[in-house]
UniProtKB/Swiss-Prot annotation:
Its EC number is 3.2.1.58. PANTHER family: GLUCAN 1,3-BETA-GLUCOSIDASE I_II-RELATED, GLUCAN ENDO-1,6-BETA-GLUCOSIDASE B. It comes from Yarrowia lipolytica (strain CLIB 122 / E 150) (Yeast). It is found in: Secreted. It is an enzyme of class 3 (hydrolase). This is Glucan 1,3-beta-glucosidase. It comes from the Eukaryota. Residues 1-15 form the signal peptide. Its main location: secreted. Coiled coil: none annotated.
Amino acid sequence: MKLTKLVALAGAALASPIQLVPREGSFLGFNYGSEKVHGVNLGGWFVLEPFITPSLFEAFGNNDANVPVDEYHYTAWLGKEEAEKRLTDHWNTWITEYDIKAIAENYKLNLVRIPIGYWAFSLLPNDPYVQGQEAYLDRALGWCRKYGVKAWVDVHGVPGSQNGFDNSGLRDHWDWPNADNVQHSINVINYIAGKYGAPEYNDIVVGIELVNEPLGPAIGMEVIEKYFQEGFWTVRHAGSDTAVVIHDAFQEKNYFNNFMTTEQGFWNVVLDHHQYQVFSPGELARNIDQHIAEVCNVGRQASTEYHWRIFGEWSAALTDCTHWLNGVGKGPRLDGSFPGSYYQRSCQGRGDIQTWSEQDKQESRRYVEAQLDAWEHGGDGWIYWTYKTENALEWDFRRLVDNGIFPFPYWDRQFPNQCGF
């Protein structure tokens, strides 16, 4: 498909928090603004993350120096043939029809966010990545239709990496902001919008996320904002009114109030917030009351934002103790193993629920419940990160439900109204 040109933007207008409605004549497939999103991410499926599926990386040995740090190096080290063999088996088994059925019928959730890399749709010359994900994505969307679950297609990695995180496909690089890489990303959005934004998917795909977690402080907001605008019009010129999802790029709440508004000629825009409190020593030093106060504060701040907003990633984690959470070869900040951190307390036993004290369990439950309340008060719902892992307890939705840390059903409360909303 030939990429359409970016339409000139309408003049800027002062935006204020209003009750947004879908553009007349458009069909979103989900009533943002009046219906809440209750979802899970299908992390580690089409974009590898070592902390979610460590077994794929541990196959390289016990020495971290010999373990690939991301999917780029995973495929490069194995070569195309072997990488395709291993990953095809992973794609076929990590998420099955049983999972989508359980998400809908057991957990009573209404949406899945599906991270996928640009390489699933279009490779760059010399890319080591392998393809084949698209067929499994299509199969998953068929299961979503069967069980009444909505989906976001989330471009989790773009060429050169938008943040340097391993979950972008390429760790420790920030090479996305050049014309060729951005154009390749737009071409991928054009393809996704033309296929998954078409009428036959309108009842399932209710969001196309242009890029996951672009690191605004590192790559600059000018590049990101221009890409968001061009990506929006690329989706619209593909003939799709599907909601366009933009990530907050790690900016303060209300930063985007005057950006891509209906007054400026944009419509069906959703803002995606990701909230964690474990990726700095200062956050880890907070006690449970301070963690919850931060959650409540974020919820209040977000409640005044202009756009529809979803808290598209968050977790129960109160530590960064999970193996490889900070990356292959990097230990936790909590015990001082991470470069530049300092010892606060031990990680011993944090990954085994059997070793948790009743206080540990109660504090984690309180933290989850506060977030559920805040993300619904401050926004239009939430999507938990992530549905399943091999052994990352604090991040694993299913294990947390099984062990009474995540409420089941999700509206059950042992610690109601912690924020006083």
